[in-house]
Amino acid sequence: MAQASRKAVVAIAGSSGMIGSALAAALRANDHLVLRIVRRTPANAEELHWNPESGEFDTDAITDVDAVVNLCGVNLGQRRWSGSFKQNLRDSRITPTEVLSAAVAEAGVKTFINASAVGYYGNTRDRVVDENDRAGTGFLAQLCQDWEGATLPAQYAGTRVILARTGMVLAQEAGVLSRMRPLFSFALGARIGNGRQYMSWISLEDEVRALLFAISHQSLSGPLNLTGPAPVTNAEFTTAFGRAINRPTPLMLPSFAVRAALGEFADEGLLIGQRAIPAALERAGFQFHHNTIGEALSYATTRPSQN
């Protein structure tokens, strides 16, 4: 936080989501003050109103804030992609970031942490990438570039900006595992396509711990891969998840079937992957609680996610 010896004030946009709610709980557990940035009428003094579509936000409300964390964004796999939904994916990320970045710059907030994704790197195949690698190609890679680019006003103002390029977050109650578990429980879990595409993952516990680490470590800035240290192929993930819940995983879902069911999202989000590693986090001394996919899945499937 701003200083380890005093309570920090952290404002969070997107605090009702899986990551945001877990981060808010962890901050409060460490006796820090959390301000939730909400669209509705604030229920108490710890909520700040905004309307990102209209640009409405009271900059004065964050002049005494130590860090602003922006986790806004519609879920990529929420529905089959259409032109309008792809625009929604962009608008739900870029517009809030533009509003908050300008507000942070005007208010002089010292730290701005903005969500991004490892999709920034495009399809890396089996090539290992870290924060020094260039952006890839495709819709998601361009989306991430534009999303990160929306933080420029804060960067130009001298704010310490963290671009939190997150992988697949593993948690019990929400996220991808909660959607996959019913299929795997009936032995219907399957590798996707040839299963050789890489998946960069992180447990929810380590995701939150990494965000707390980024807030408190002033030496960190720029892109930060929030992923576990050992990315795995889709086939390896499928086997590990089946093992974690004691179910066989003998099936394979052909690429053509995935494309038929999910359209463009299949080629952008499931049939390609990123082999991203958390080089910047590890250089800064961050230590993961879950270093392997087996450890992360065992944790996420045998106990409630907590921090």
UniProtKB/Swiss-Prot annotation:
Disulfide bonds: none annotated. It comes from the Bacteria. Pfam families: DUF1731 (PF08338), Epimerase (PF01370). Belongs to the NAD(P)-dependent epimerase/dehydratase family. SDR39U1 subfamily. NCBIfam families: yfcH (TIGR01777). This is Epimerase family protein ML0860.
